């Protein structure tokens, strides 16, 4: 794959053999962004788990204190009073059978979904569409609930879902390149703490095997997986 001149110039600032601290990686991500807009800062984590085994699945939710820098579009499966509650909370799309039908026809212009329990039989008809995209409502992530207003508000306020893929990789967005160092570090710390907290008891050996920071269309920045504590102190002292 041929890389752009801007990408190659950015990549030259990064030593792929070096492990950077999270603060160094945040600053490099901001410096090596190759887009003309505020790029997304993403973290890719290789976990020491076997996702093929049910007792080693890693998934969860976390509320980023500074959000992701993007207002996610939320689709809600609800009817009656709960539909009105969802709309009042800021849901972008609200529906029931009609929303299911739209999705069956190819509509996917949303970033997250929420559903009331009574709607799940209908949502099940599009599980093969939503599931692979990480968009299926799930009670474990608080997206199948009667408290629709809170669920929508949480997502709009910076709540994100994470789930390890078949290769043992997990991807999370921690903000934009126009965030301050402290905002990105705080988001990263909160997310990483939650990922560590939900480590499966069946997982053996090193859990955090590899961590890489990157920006939209930017080069990867290897981060020391052992630097998981005192990140805020590091940020304050730098």
UniProtKB/Swiss-Prot annotation:
CDD domains: Ribosomal_L1. It comes from the Bacteria. It comes from Frankia casuarinae (strain DSM 45818 / CECT 9043 / HFP020203 / CcI3). The lineage of its organism: Bacteria, Bacillati, Actinomycetota, Actinomycetes, Frankiales. InterPro entries: Ribosom_uL1_bac-type (IPR005878), Ribosomal_uL1 (IPR002143), Ribosomal_uL1-like (IPR023674), Ribosomal_uL1/biogenesis (IPR028364), Ribosomal_uL1_3-a/b-sand (IPR016095), Ribosomal_uL1_CS (IPR023673). Part of the 50S ribosomal subunit. This is Large ribosomal subunit protein uL1. Keywords: Repressor, Ribonucleoprotein, Ribosomal protein, RNA-binding, rRNA-binding, Translation regulation, tRNA-binding. Belongs to the universal ribosomal protein uL1 family. Binds directly to 23S rRNA. The L1 stalk is quite mobile in the ribosome, and is involved in E site tRNA release. Protein L1 is also a translational repressor protein, it controls the translation of the L11 operon by binding to its mRNA. The keyword Zinc-finger does not apply. GO terms for biological process: regulation of translation; translation. Pfam families: Ribosomal_L1. SUPFAM superfamilies: Ribosomal protein L1. One of its GO terms (cellular component) is large ribosomal subunit. One of its GO terms (molecular function) is structural constituent of ribosome.
């Amino acid at each position: 794959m041929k890389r752009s001149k801007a990408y190659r110039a950015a990549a030259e600032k990064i030593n792929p053999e070096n492990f950077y601290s999270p603060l160094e990686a945040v600053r490099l991500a901001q410096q090596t962004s190759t887009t003309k807009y505020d790029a997304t800062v993403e973290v890719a984590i290789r976990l020491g788990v076997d996702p093929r085994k049910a007792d080693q699945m890693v998934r969860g939710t976390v509320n980023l204190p500074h959000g992701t820098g993007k207002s996610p579009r939320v689709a809600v499966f609800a009817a009656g009073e709960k539909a009105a509650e969802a709309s009042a909370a800021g849901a972008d799309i609200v529906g029931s059978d009609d929303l299911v039908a739209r999705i069956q026809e190819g509509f996917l212009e949303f970033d997250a979904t929420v559903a009331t329990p009574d709607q799940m039989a209908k949502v099940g008809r599009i599980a093969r569409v939503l599931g692979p995209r990480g968009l299926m409502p799930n009670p474990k992530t608080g997206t199948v609930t009667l408290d629709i207003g809170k669920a929508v508000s949480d997502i709009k306020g910076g709540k994100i879902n994470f789930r390890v893929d078949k290769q043992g990789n997990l991807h999370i967005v921690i903000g934009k390149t126009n965030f301050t160092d402290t905002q990105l570090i705080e988001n990263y710390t909160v997310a990483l703490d939650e990922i560590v907290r939900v480590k499966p008891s069946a997982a053996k050996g090193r859990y955090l095997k590899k961590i890489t920071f990157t920006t939209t269309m930017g080069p990867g920045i290897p981060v020391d997986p052992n630097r998981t504590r005192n990140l805020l102190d590091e940020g304050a002292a730098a």
